């Protein structure tokens, strides 16, 4: 509608059109919408409309006079000829302004317009930022930067900023704090050590989520915040910042009173990953390794004694009747040789059965001597019964030493190397 009027006015010429034809229709239009996305020139406040003739592409033939000065009062019927095209455009724009005439901000811009960076370079001169006046929800933020991890960046001049997932960041061209009282209030908000070079300023420190830049005063006690500072989870603006009292401490003053915005702390920041650790696996409890069964020598010796008692035919010979010591020893040696031949290289014994050890040489000599003595006694005393009676106690006395020198007892000691080999 605006473009049609401007083209028609430019083709016909401003001189040929009567002034009274547009006065009633253009001066009392109905407000079409309060939405913020009507003009691609950007959203502007009332005080910004004076720069419309310089910035926006809607140019007039004589742009020297500002558009608002050529608007007449509603009572006067005479209009300036030069202002006909200006009135056609500006009356619509003035009624479609988003902010009220009292200065109170209306609805904020849409989410797409806030986040979009699709303005071209040609329209960058026309674009101005939408800044509400003293709003509790909308704070002036130029760019939302996300510094995850909370790294402290130190610069060459000693200027340090703690930059973490910033829900608030001061713009690069921030408002200059003009008085030392504001400095004192700003530094007292974050508590800690007193800043250097600021007279009468409350202490400021760096702890946890707070930031404490080394702010150097520039001529006349002014602080120049040229770099963008960020304060995590804090939402405040310099427009309505009121410094707390001098004796207020974080313990005495409640949290909502100390916050300038009066809003609760936002816990839904997407980049704050300090509370939960991502990608950390829980360690499983270490499995207790079961100990391998060790060799129980006492039990093995007991099994060996029972095996020897079963294999030896001493009990059977006693039940059958009196035998000569020669026959008794021969039966013992035959039983052991049969066991050794069975467990030789041809066949293997079961794993649980103890293996009898080979006869020691001393025991072999003892058996040989015993056999020789028994043979001599049997030859010399074959017909004499008394000689046989004397040989029996001697054989019984000799047999008493045999259990002590038996194969499996060996004073309770086993040859472990022989067991492992078998």
From Swiss-Prot:
GO terms for biological process: positive regulation of canonical Wnt signaling pathway; protein import into nucleus; regulation of canonical Wnt signaling pathway; Wnt signaling pathway. Residues 245-269 are annotated as: Disordered. This is Protein FAM53B. It comes from the Eukaryota. The keyword Nucleotidyltransferase does not apply. PANTHER family: PROTEIN FAM53A-LIKE ISOFORM X1, PROTEIN FAM53B. Acts as a regulator of Wnt signaling pathway by regulating beta-catenin (CTNNB1) nuclear localization. Keywords: Nucleus, Phosphoprotein, Wnt signaling pathway. The gene is FAM53B. A motif (Nuclear localization signal) lies at residues 281-284. It comes from Homo sapiens (Human). The modification Phosphoserine is found at residues 118, 167, 169, 179, 212, 268. Belongs to the FAM53 family. One of its GO terms (cellular component) is nucleus.
């Amino acid at each position: 509608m605006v473009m049609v009027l401007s083209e028609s006015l430019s083709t016909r010429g401003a001189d040929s059109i009567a002034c009274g034809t547009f006065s009633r229709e253009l001066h009392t239009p109905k407000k079409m919408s309060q939405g913020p996305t009507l003009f691609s020139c950007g959203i502007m406040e009332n005080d910004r409309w004076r720069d419309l003739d310089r910035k926006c592409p809607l140019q007039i033939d004589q742009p020297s006079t500002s558009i608002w000065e050529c608007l007449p009062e509603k009572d006067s019927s005479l209009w300036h000829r030069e202002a006909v095209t200006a009135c056609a455009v500006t009356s619509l724009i003035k009624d479609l302004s988003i902010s009220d005439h009292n200065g109170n901000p209306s609805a904020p811009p849409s989410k797409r317009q806030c986040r979009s960076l699709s303005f071209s370079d040609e329209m960058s001169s026309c674009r101005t930022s939408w800044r509400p006046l003293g709003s509790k929800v909308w704070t002036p933020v130029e760019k939302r930067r996300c510094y995850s991890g909370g790294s402290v960046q130190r610069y060459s001049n000693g200027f340090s900023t703690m930059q973490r997932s910033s829900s608030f960041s001061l713009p690069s061209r921030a408002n200059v704090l003009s008085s030392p009282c504001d400095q004192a209030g700003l530094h007292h908000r974050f508590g800690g050590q007193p800043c250097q070079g600021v007279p009468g300023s409350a202490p400021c420190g760096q702890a946890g989520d707070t930031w404490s830049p080394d702010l150097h005063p520039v001529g006349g006690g002014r602080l120049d915040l040229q770099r963008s500072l960020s304060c995590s989870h804090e939402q405040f603006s310099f427009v309505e910042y009121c410094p707390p009292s001098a004796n207020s401490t974080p313990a005495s003053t409640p949290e909502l009173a100390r916050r300038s915005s009066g809003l609760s702390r936002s816990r839904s920041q997407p980049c704050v990953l300090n509370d939960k650790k991502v990608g950390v696996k829980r360690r499983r409890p270490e499995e207790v390794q079961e100990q391998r069964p060790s060799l129980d020598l006492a039990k093995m010796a007991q099994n060996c004694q029972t095996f020897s008692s079963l294999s030896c035919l001493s009990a059977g010979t006693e039940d059958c009747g009196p035998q000569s010591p020669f026959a008794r020893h021969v039966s013992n040696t035959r039983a052991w040789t049969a066991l050794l031949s069975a467990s030789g290289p041809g066949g293997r014994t079961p794993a649980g059965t103890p293996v009898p050890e080979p006869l020691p040489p001393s025991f072999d000599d003892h058996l040989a001597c015993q056999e020789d003595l028994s043979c001599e006694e049997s030859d010399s005393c074959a017909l004499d019964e008394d000689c046989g009676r004397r040989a029996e106690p001697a054989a019984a006395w000799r047999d008493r030493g045999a259990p002590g020198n038996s194969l499996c007892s060996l004073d309770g000691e086993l040859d472990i190397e022989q067991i492992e080999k078998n």
